[in-house]
Design a protein with these regions (language model features):
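Internal, well-ordered domain-core segments that constitute the primary functional module
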Residues: 116-118, 131-138, 148-163
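Conserved SAM-binding loop
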Residues: 36, 88, 130
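Conserved pre-motif I regulatory segment
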Residues: 2-60
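Conserved motor-coupling elements within RecA-like helicase/translocase cores
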Residues: 105, 116-130
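Conserved catalytic network of the ASCE P-loop NTPase/AAA+ motor domain
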Residues: 79-81, 122-124, 147-151, 279-282
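A short beta-strand-to-loop transition that corresponds to the Sensor-1 phosphate-sensing loop
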Residues: 92, 128-136, 160-161, 290-294
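Conserved Walker A/P-loop ATP-binding site and its immediately adjacent core
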Residues: 63-115, 136-139, 296-299
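Conserved coupling segment at the C-terminus of the helicase ATP-binding
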Residues: 25-28, 41-42, 48, 52, ...
Length: 327
């Protein structure tokens, strides 16, 4: 008797339902996976009926309410609606493994980066959710590209978004440790020496003797006047780990950066983060942030360029005081 392999393969694929609650019922779940929790059903139902077409969405689910599964179901729903490629972003590699384990447990198709740096074809084709970590996307040498040369995405979800914020900010920051890169540190101190003496001679002496608790900002006019010399120093040492991933982001934007010097390190950071540099996130059709705690609303608007309406009206369950807003 001939075996119908097509039929067997078809039985292992997800029925193309777009309602995430109905979709959950079609998954090839392992026996340990039970029904959806009430909190999950609330969020999924209200997203599907009220916020499905929103470009920007913030979901707040308290610890233990199963936000990982909610995120995976939302992205699978969007994939089934042909709104891929879909990207699930975690704050670190450890949580990537956790999310992959959840996806496997619930029978949701996913892919990850293998040993090579190539973006998986299953992601590009819109057939599987790509699960990765925030550093993979937000760096000056990102495999997803920067500026006008970026990989187009349909839907991007950032899990534990509050934990991702610091990583995104640090992607634009060069931090030069005196202990790891004494030569670069010394060259920069020499470059700004005269101007820093004028700013505060005593504090500058403390910095030169290695005082960890003293730091000074390079005056904007001094930074602007010596930006070419500064670029030469950084360009010549851009292969250093502390410079390598940030250099492409700041090399043509140095006038929009500022510099702080302490006895232990030099930090060069922008006045404002330019999230549009990362088009795979910035220009996605749908952008979803998930978190158990949201403390830095201002960065969602100013940094990630989320709409104020998305910050004001969040999707989630009420807290014990009944204060959290729902969709």
């Amino acid at each position: 008797m001939a075996i119908d392999f097509k039929k067997k393969l078809a039985s292992r694929t997800i029925t193309s339902k777009t309602n995430p609650i109905e979709l959950y019922g079609t998954l090839d779940r392992k026996s340990v996976a039970g029904p959806l929790r009430p909190a999950q059903e609330i969020v999924l139902s209200e997203w599907y009926t009220k916020r499905r077409t929103d470009r920007d969405l913030i979901i707040k689910l308290h610890a233990g309410e199963g936000k990982t599964l909610v995120g995976l179901l939302l992205l699978q729903s969007l994939l089934n609606s042909k709104e891929g490629p879909c990207l699930y972003i975690c704050p670190n590699k450890y949580l990537v493994r956790q999310v992959c384990s959840e996806a496997d447990k619930f029978g949701i198709p996913f892919c990850t980066f293998g040993e090579s740096a190539e973006i998986p074809n299953d992601f590009l084709a819109g057939s599987k959710i790509l699960i990765t970590h925030v550093q993979k996307i937000f760096n000056g040498r990102s495999v997803f590209g920067t500026d006008n040369n970026y990989i187009k995405t349909g839907s991007v979800l950032m899990d534990d978004s509050h934990a991702c914020i610091d990583t995104i900010k640090s992607a634009f920051t060069i931090s030069i440790s005196k202990s790891e890169n004494p030569e670069i540190y010394s060259k920069i101190l020499t470059l700004f020496n005269d101007d820093m003496i004028e700013q505060g001679e005593g504090s500058w002496l403390d910095i030169q003797t290695g005082d960890y608790n003293t730091f000074m900002a390079v005056p904007y006019w001094s930074w602007n006047n010596k930006k070419t010399e500064m670029l030469r120093i950084l360009s010549a040492t851009q292969e250093k780990r502390q410079i390598y991933y940030t250099w492409p982001l700041m090399c043509d934007q140095i006038e929009n950066y500022c510099c702080y010097i302490s006895g232990s390190k030099i930090e060069i950071s922008p006045y404002n983060v330019s999230i549009r540099t990362f088009g795979s996130f910035s220009y996605a059709t749908h952008r979803i942030l998930m978190s158990a705690t949201i403390q830095d609303d201002s960065f969602f608007v100013k940094g990630l360029e989320f709409s104020p309406e998305a910050v004001r009206i969040r999707c989630g369950t009420k807290n014990k005081n009944g204060l959290a807003k729902k969709c």
